Regions:
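Structural signature of hydrophobic alpha-helical transmembrane segments
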Residues: 2-11, 63-68, 121-124, 185-191, ...
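Membrane-embedded alpha-helical segments and adjacent helix-loop junctions characteristic
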Residues: 49-134, 271-358
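Membrane-helix interface "capping/anchor" motifs
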Residues: 19-33, 137-143, 269-270, 333-346
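N-terminal alpha-helical transmembrane segments of multi-pass membrane transport
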Residues: 1-70, 78, 89-90, 202-212, ...
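Membrane-interface helix termini and inter-helical loops of multi-pass transporters
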Residues: 49-58, 170-180, 241-248, 301-316, ...
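Alpha-helical transmembrane segments of multi-pass membrane proteins
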Residues: 100-115, 138-158, 184, 321-334, ...
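Long, contiguous bundles of hydrophobic transmembrane helices that form the permeation core
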Residues: 1-17, 37, 41-43, 183-276, ...
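Membrane-core helix-loop-helix motifs of multi-pass transport proteins
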Residues: 1-2, 133-225, 363-365, 388-434
Length: 434
């Protein structure tokens, strides 16, 4: 394949996804299945016929990842319906703190389901809904409520132990299946934490004002309901940092299953486990559909020769791996900004092979940074942004993602800078992977 053909096929894929992104206004749930169709069209244009097998087999690499996220979603939603999160929320708002400290604790509370599942929408549908309704009832300006829940959901997705957008490229790296999102606890924490601290310091007083303790929030049960969370936290930390001392006990699916069973025993109120699990899975379905579509694009680019041709040309040209990672990472951000998160995933699929190949042997953290750029596109997107989803969930209209971003320029720049650092210097920061 010559370079012109590679660019043509790349343009076909990007054009199809761009068109459906515009037509469906960034609705990820509608666009994700159409990305598979874009893969079929690209294969047809390449003269390879109707290649259903290749377009659909890529997502199977994420079967383990799906289990991690689905088990986490079932566990976190059970904590929502059995009263554990309500008990925690009463503690969050029941004490007087400085605005910055209160914002920090509130963001961590909202982000908790996101940390467990690696998704933003799990937070929006549970703790975000809970905190958002409370703040609206307290008379807070609607745009500020949407902002707090949006940032909380974004931070929850980015903070460890899991981050679905970062898991996609790190696991799919250069087609070398299977991969694993292990060793990334400290790197993803270091990437996200500075932006979180900056946001809380700058937005605490602006958004919350002088925070007053509220002891009237309804709560049931006792601190015993926190046992499942505590056990899961200990098991996650041991799994990530004491793996050389403790025998392997099954990873995240088993950890979350243990938490799920404990949450049926130590609870504030009764909950149907089957309904909780099903509802929890629904909260993460769209984001999981996107990584399956992403895997389909990776496989399609491999099939039609786009990845191999472009990678070979860059190798021949002697382009530095850090430059390739930086340019493609910024293209992910730009594509997500203009056309939404599904388009960012498609550009990220191209970046997966090119960045890993150009940084062979030390590609782990640049790949994580590409995933973080995809995650950030949910915050930046002009259509189908995370803020719009939050507004729909809370029943708030007229608040756009652009408005939230404009009010938090410094936060946005700090997070972008952290992503750039890992894109450019990720090879030198590999010592952070434990």
């Amino acid at each position: 394949m010559n370079l012109t053909e590679a660019y043509l096929l790349l343009a076909v894929m990007l054009a199809v996804v761009a068109v459906v992104s515009v037509l469906f206004k960034g609705e990820s749930g509608l666009i994700a299945p159409l990305i598979f169709v874009a893969g079929l069209i690209t294969a047809l244009v390449a003269g390879l016929g109707f290649r259903l097998r290749e377009v659909t087999e890529g997502p199977f690499v994420f079967v383990d990842t799906l289990m991690w996220v689905l088990c986490g979603a079932a566990f976190s939603y059970l904590l929502y319906v059995n009263g554990t999160f309500q008990f925690l929320f009463a503690k969050v708002v029941g004490k007087k703190r400085s605005p910055a400290a209160q914002m920090f604790i509130l963001i961590l509370f909202i982000g908790l389901p996101g940390m467990i599942t690696g998704t933003a929408l799990a937070s929006v549908a549970t703790t975000g809904l809970m905190a958002g309704r409370y703040l609206l009832d307290k008379g807070m300006e609607k745009s500020k409520v949407v902002e707090v829940v949006t940032v909380g959901a974004l931070m929850g997705m980015l903070l460890p132990p899991l981050c679905v957008p970062a898991m996609a490229p790190t696991i799919a790296r250069q087609g070398l299946y299977p991969g694993a999102f292990e060793g990334y606890f400290l790197p993803i924490l270091i990437l996200a934490l500075p932006a979180l601290i900056v946001y809380c310091a700058l937005a605490g007083r602006r958004v919350l004002g002088e925070w007053e303790a509220d002891g009237n929030v309804e709560k049931t049960g006792s601190a015993v309901c926190l046992i499942p969370l505590a056990v899961v936290a200990v098991l996650v930390l041991c799994y990530n940092f004491l793996y050389f001392l403790i025998p392997y006990y099954g990873g995240y699916p088993v950890i979350y299953l243990i938490g799920f069973v404990l949450a049926l025993i130590f609870k504030c109120k009764g909950a149907n486990p089957l309904i909780a699990a099903a509802d929890g899975i629904r909260t993460v379905a769209v984001e999981l559909a996107l990584i399956l579509a992403y895997a389909s694009v990776v496989e399609t680019f491999n099939l039609v020769g786009v990845n191999g041709t472009l990678s070979a040309q860059m190798e021949i040209a002697g382009i530095n791996g850090a430059v390739i990672a930086l340019v493609l990472g910024l293209l992910v951000l730009a594509g997500g900004l203009l056309l939404g998160t599904p388009f960012a995933y498609v550009v990220g699929a191209l970046a997966t092979y090119l960045v890993s190949n150009s940084n062979y042997g030390s590609y782990e953290l640049p790949m994580m940074a590409v995933g973080a750029a995809i995650a950030m596109s949910m915050f930046l997107a002009l259509r189908g942004s995370l803020a719009e989803t939050v507004g729909e969930t809370l029943g708030v209209t007229g608040v756009t993602g652009t408005e939230v971003v404009k009010r938090n320029i410094i936060f946005t720049l700090v997070l972008t800078a952290a992503i750039v650092v890992f894109l450019v210097a990720g090879s030198s920061l590999k010592f952070l992977m434990i």
